Amino acid sequence: MNKILTPQNRQIFFFIVLAYAFSVLCRLDWVWWASGFDEFIYNGKIIINTNDGYAFGEGARDMLAGFHQEGDLSYYGAPLSTLAYLIVKFTPFSLEGVMLYLSAVLSSLIVIPLILIAKTLGAPRAGLCAALLASIAHSYYNRTMVGYFDTDMLNIVLACFIIWGLVRLNAYKDTISALIASLSMLIYFWWYSSSFTLNVALIAMFLLYTLIWHKKEKIYYLTMILMLLAITSIAIWFKILLFALILFLYKSKFYQLSNKQNAIIIALGALIFAIFALSGGLNPIWFQLKFYLLRSTPEKDTLNFIFFNVNQTISESSIIPFGLFSERISSALGVFVLSFVGYVLAIFRHKILLLSLPMCALGFLALFSGLRFTIYAVPFMAFGFGFLLEILGSALNERIKQKSLFLFHLCRFCIYKANLV
């Protein structure tokens, strides 16, 4: 108990509560604004402001009713609809209330992994600064505000929890960290199936990092095996069963006392990769590359009719100027520049932050593939800003200490001379 209630842990808890409350309160501003317009009121309640939100809400409504009509395209059983259904079923909250406020409650959880990453790296104040900035950066705020009932409310949160698990693994080399990273990826893939490409990029980056700096650490390879299993297209109950079996084997005396640990890890990795490949694991990667990177031109059929690619007709997929790009990520061009400098310095100081590159790269893809991607760069660019402030603050404190020490010795010298006189 005393270990849990250390001064540092109390400080981290205070930082998390402060940043979370700040994030939620900032999002409530939309409620006060919308309540002043009759167009946003229906049956005495504020309505949500996204089209997709009503589709997810319909799915939750049908789940509460226990049925839906065949062919009605209901989001019955969708992860967000399922979560809303469970909250309404087992709490006193109404479906309308859940649809309105859930985004503010869940998206504000972004502050937790950012602060915990900073704590693990020994810079908790940088984490607090990053949490405060990331929670209200234009891109993240706009896509997670009250009334924005969409999967975006957890997309970035879960990705950051994955990276926190890997940062923690790098510090402690324990199975708890491996579980944090792999279970976060499991939930992320269930929550948002389009996260597959980012998850693959995170695994690939972690593999590269491991081969360069930690190629003899077996716990790293175990974590990669579990992460790959998490994004395999098989039943979730079967994944959880395999998770348990793999961890049981890793902790067993059979493995711990074996002189063929490397062979066992390789065999496990080959087995999981085979399941991954046979379940169609490479197909989504190719689809995403075609859709976002190979931004071709209109598709043509044999009769020469021209059809625009979908990503050419969606405003979120439109190419944006650099000024708007920087404002979407860091709210201002100057802050963006400082954030970028701080992010580079943070990577030089802590190589493990290289694992955040896939998220930032996806965010920077917005320059070519549309503003919808800027949200991915928000948390770690904000971390870069916080880290830069941490460095500047430490340098300033050191100068103040040096000046204070100089003044102290100067005073001693003056007093000494005065006594001589």
Residue ranges and their predicted role:
Residues M1-Y42, T120, G127-L128, L245-F273, ...:
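Start-transfer (signal-anchor) and selected internal transmembrane alpha helices
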Residues I12, A126-C129, R168, D174-I180, ...:
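Membrane-interfacial loop-to-transmembrane alpha-helix junctions, especially the N-terminal start
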Residues S23, L102-I117, A126-N170, D174-T210, ...:
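Membrane-embedded helix bundles of polyisoprenyl
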Residues L28-L121, R125-C160, Y188:
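Active-site lumenal/periplasmic loops and adjacent helix-entry segments of GT-C-fold
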Residues L198-I265, L389-E398:
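Perimembrane helix-loop-helix junctions
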Residues W237-A244, F273-S356:
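Alpha-helical transmembrane segments at the extracellular/periplasmic loop-to-helix junctions
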Residues I266-A270, F383, I391-L420:
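Signature aromatic-anchored transmembrane alpha helix within multi-pass, membrane-resident enzymes
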Residues L354-L357, L362-S404:
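Hydrophobic/aromatic-rich transmembrane helices and adjacent perimembrane loops
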